[in-house]
């Protein structure tokens, strides 16, 4: 069996969630957290390694809540995303407190990855179908010449909306099943008729709820890490003095690779509903959703019993 890894980005500070570490909030009937379901679905689909990207200061609590339990059923590795972990002679601006973004998070796992891998957010529930499709893509043989072949799980925007506040989504532009561009779209709100994005000037634009969006679930290769590292150096070199919030984002880098002809991204559409704990108010509805999935037999009571 070809080795494949699930890489979980769990280093976010959870600033929108309020008190507590949102990635570790129990949501399942037996106290499971969202990552339990993600790992369950990934292992069921054929993944056989899990890499947690976390902050070093959260390591002990993280292992207690989930890490040690998962290490009993599959291979586990840890990578630490630290704000001062920068290449070469780059140094962190003294007043920067914001993490460097999803690109930097994945780069933190470079030393523990030598196999094809899927990347997900720790606090997102993706459903079962996406793991099967991404895993099956990663174990296929792809042409070695030409652009690098990677994939993305595409979710319908209407299946990813939030009842309790605004969200950011990477809206995808697709031709013949290939991703041709990603537009990072901010301030998306659920409306009675669907969805809209609200601009700073007070105007709003209606969005197509059937359009596919990126939920940061990518199927990538070890070779991608080299490009990711080079891109981060270029990103740091291009930051204007005084900019302490600019982030190195995975969708933006992949967008650049597509336009330069360096990557071909296959979009694997999933019709599953996404949900996650973005805001404190989301927790009750997410708990109810997992209870229903359990009652309906999608998941057993007690995932790993």
Predicted regions and their residues:
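Conserved nucleotide-sugar donor-binding
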Residues: 217-229
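A C-terminal functional module that forms or caps the active site or interfaces directly
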Residues: 229-263
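A structural signal for short hydrophobic beta-strand segments in well-ordered beta-sheet cores
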Residues: 24, 171-174, 267
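Glycine-rich N-terminal loop/short-helix segment of MobA-like nucleotidyltransferase
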Residues: 2-29, 45
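Conserved N-terminal catalytic core of the sugar/cofactor nucleotidyltransferase
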Residues: 1-8, 32-119, 126-127, 131, ...
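Short, surface-exposed amphipathic charged segments that create phosphate/polyanion-binding patches used
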Residues: 88-99, 165-170, 281-285
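Conserved core of the sugar-phosphate nucleotidyltransferase
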Residues: 128-217
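Generic C-terminus detector
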Residues: 282-305
């Amino acid at each position: 069996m070809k080795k494949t890894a699930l890489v979980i980005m769990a280093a976010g500070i959870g600033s929108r969630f309020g008190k507590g570490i949102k990635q570790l909030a129990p949501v399942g009937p037996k106290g499971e957290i969202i990552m339990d379901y993600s790992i369950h679905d990934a292992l069921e689909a054929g993944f056989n390694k899990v890499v947690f990207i976390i902050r070093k200061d959260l390591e002990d609590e993280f292992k207690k809540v989930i890490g040690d339990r998962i290490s009993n059923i599959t291979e586990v590795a840890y990578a630490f995303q630290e704000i001062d972990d920068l290449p070469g002679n780059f140094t962190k601006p003294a007043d920067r407190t914001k993490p460097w973004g999803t690109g930097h998070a994945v780069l933190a796992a470079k030393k523990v990855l030598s196999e094809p891998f899927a990347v997900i957010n720790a606090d997102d529930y993706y459903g079962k179908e996406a793991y099967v499709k991404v895993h099956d893509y990663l174990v296929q043989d792809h042409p070695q010449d030409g652009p690098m072949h990677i994939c993305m799980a595409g979710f319908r925007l209407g299946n990813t909306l939030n009842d309790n506040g605004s969200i950011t989504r990477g809206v995808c532009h697709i031709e013949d099943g290939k991703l041709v561009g990603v537009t990072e779209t901010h301030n998306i709100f659920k409306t009675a008729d669907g969805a809209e994005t609200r601009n700073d000037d007070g105007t709003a634009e209606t969005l197509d709820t059937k359009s596919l969006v990126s939920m940061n679930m990518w199927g990538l290769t070890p070779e991608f890490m080299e490009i990711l590292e080079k891109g981060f150096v270029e990103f740091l070199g291009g930051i204007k003095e005084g900019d302490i919030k600019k982030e190195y984002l995975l969708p933006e880098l992949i967008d650049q690779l597509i336009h330069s002809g360096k990557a071909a991204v296959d979009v694997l559409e999933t019709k599953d509903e996404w949900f996650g704990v973005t805001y404190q108010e989301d927790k009750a509805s997410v708990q109810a959703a997992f209870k229903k999935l359990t009652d309906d037999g999608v998941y057993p009571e007690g995932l790993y019993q």
